[in-house]
Amino acid sequence: YPTYDNAKYFGTGYLLLMDFDANHSVKVGMNNALSFDKYLEDVSTWDVITDNGPVLSFSSYNQCLHAFSNPEDLPFTSERGENEQGTGIGGDYEFIIVDAPEDASYMMLKGKKRGTYNLLTPLQEGVMFKDYLAEINEFSTLMFGNNILEPDVLHMGDAKYRFADAADGVP
């Protein structure tokens, strides 16, 4: 899913885990820079609204999800002299539902504000978010090293491989 936005994309993406229930409650879990590399979980509400088509809206504040749309300065970028006051990361909390097959094998979303595509895929029932994210982080550390400033470097034995344009926003 390409994007035609000329804005400069940054970062390599953030993994969020979500558990939606039929009562319009959603549990969101994450462990990344926006949670200061600690596991964070919050529960809020969701709804599907109509706005030139179906839109998934996170209609109440969620500490995990709304960290991406909060227009505050990011404290962990201050050392680099960056100031995001007024824009933050520029993330969304309302998403156009681009594709949602009847078999629920995935859902493709597009942020209403930024236009970034997001893919939702189901996890197995009963997966504990905190444990799952710990396993992902353990694998990432094994493959990409610990305390590496640029996560676009793959370590294989003594060899290091750098990925060019790994975060250009185009899948």
What is each model feature region?
Residues Y1-E41, D51-P171:
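Lipid interaction determinants
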Residues W46-V48:
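Conserved hydrophobic positions within beta-strands
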